[in-house]
Amino acid sequence: MKLAVIGGDGIGPEVTAEALKVLNAVRDDIEVTDYDLGARRYLRNGELLADADLVSLREHDAILLGAIGAPGEVPPGVLERGLLLKMRFALDHHVNLRPSKLYPTATSPLANPGDIDFVVVREGTEGLYCGNGGTLREGTPHEIASEVSQNTRYGVERVVRDAFERAQNRKKHLTLVHKTNVLVNAGGLWQRTVNEIATEYPEVTVDYNHIDAATIYMVTDPSRYDVIVTDNLFGDILTDLAGAVTGGIGLAASGNIDATGVNPSMFEPVHGSAPDIAGQGIADPTAAILSAAMLLRHVGDESNAQRIEAAVTYDVAERPAGPVKTVEVGDRIVAALQR
């Protein structure tokens, strides 16, 4: 397997090193190419993501990302638009996949969280994040700023189909989250698409939540969810809330997926670069390791994906109270693989 690794900034290289340690413990055929992308490169020479980088990345089977960002050093939006979103659009990562599971001994802020185990399938290349907007009369009392939410039948249908496929292979329940009572045009497109595709999946039950109601249910009754499908902005908000109710983003993994398989998909922990703890060896690499498991599942290695997830579940349950070193977490999970 040809694997592109973008360690990135802050704790990114530290957690990806442990994810690679675990990957190499279950497979002996991984060829790694490291890429110097992120704030460090931008601050050094002003480069973000060159066309040559994209050409090279496309030659790999998958991409593992650590974290990108340098708060206070790089202005907001530079790395997001010039690197992360550019890569997402260029590699057609139209499915953003975020599993949310409450692991044993993980502490949820909810008094009675129940059995939380759902996935959010977020559309990744359209909506309000497509860059369709602008500003007029900037800096004047009459300034106008607009952001246009772009939703196409093609874009909506392919992510809805992906969500139905996942629901078919899970607990067979899908929830559309939107705001159809106000966003009647985009919401209507999403609702019609779900209704039409639902006829192809008679075993999957379907319901609908407004986004504001979904934020309530995710706190009061998160176990009601199996697969959530939603647009780019609503998915961005919901997945952070999902991370919070399952004990924090330290265990939150994600995938940015081209479901067609034409381009390599990218897998990453949800957390940021955390420069305040970088280099101290205390960052929790569990989310990066779970992202590696998602990566293996995507490339068809279900057996080893399940092995890693089982090892993580065992380690989280047995992990001692108090801080655990980054390297030690990786070593513990490798040891758990041998059980």
Swiss-Prot record:
Positions with a binding annotation for Mg(2+): D212, D236, D240
Single Gene Ontology MF annotation: NAD binding
EC number per UniProt: 1.1.1.85
Protein name: 3-isopropylmalate dehydrogenase
Function: Catalyzes the oxidation of 3-carboxy-2-hydroxy-4-methylpentanoate (3-isopropylmalate) to 3-carboxy-4-methyl-2-oxopentanoate. The product decarboxylates to 4-methyl-2 oxopentanoate.
GO biological process, one term: L-leucine biosynthetic process
One GO term describing the cellular component: cytoplasm
Xref: SUPFAM superfamilies: Isocitrate/Isopropylmalate dehydrogenase-like
Main location: cytoplasm
Pathway: Amino-acid biosynthesis; L-leucine biosynthesis; L-leucine from 3-methyl-2-oxobutanoate: step 3/4
